[in-house]
Amino acid sequence: MAKNLITKKLKNTITDDMIRVNQAGEFGAQRIYDGQLAVLKNDKTIKKMAQQEVKHLEAFNKILLERGIRPTALSPFWNLGGYLLGMTTAMIDRKVAMACTVAVEEVIDEHYKSQQEKLKNNTKEKKLFKLITKFRDEEIEHKNTALEHNAKDIKGYKVMTQGIKSITKLAIFLSKKI
């Protein structure tokens, strides 16, 4: 009996952490696009991607509330950090903003893929699995769109994207528990 209770609590903790980090990530992504759009105001491509991120954030906000999961305490940092990252990359050049999108979305692709692996046999989380699958497909679409818009044509592409990937991975790690 006690073992079943511990196992159930552990499974809930795992999905709670997933939802918390996904909500934080979608919030950060929205703030990156807000920063980019502050500079590239009429960019239809960025606006379209930003609109999808708003829907992603709304979905995870809803799940967070429904399940009574606390959001990350790091939201104020992701608020400012995401906005500054987006604004700074857009101020340098539109292609740099697109390279930022590629870097973030490559990490998110792997992050969501890992979550899919953990959830694929969990019959109680089919709805969450489908949502993550849908959002992963859209994040891959964002990456591909950014690549189509010459993201790789900037000097220092590898160095810049590796830096952004490292920051994104750190944000994911911290947001799971804090």
Residue ranges and their predicted role:
Residues 1-178:
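Non-heme di-metal
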